[in-house]
């Protein structure tokens, strides 16, 4: 079983894979990387600092205060392309 630090590193690697897959227009695979990272972060109850590093920070009105390793605009595009366009 992975330690918390090892899991954090794996999640950072998933973020790198996500960005690489987006550049290659592999939207379904990119979406899967994001969903896996999100599920693991929630299941492991990672610290808020790590979740913010990975997924960013939003303000009270929904504005993006800090971008994460999974940039929201790319996540939205991956979901759109994978779900609507089914590429």
Pin down the residues of each PLM region.
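TPR-adjacent "capping" and linker segments in tetratricopeptide-repeat scaffold/adaptor proteins
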Residues: 1-10
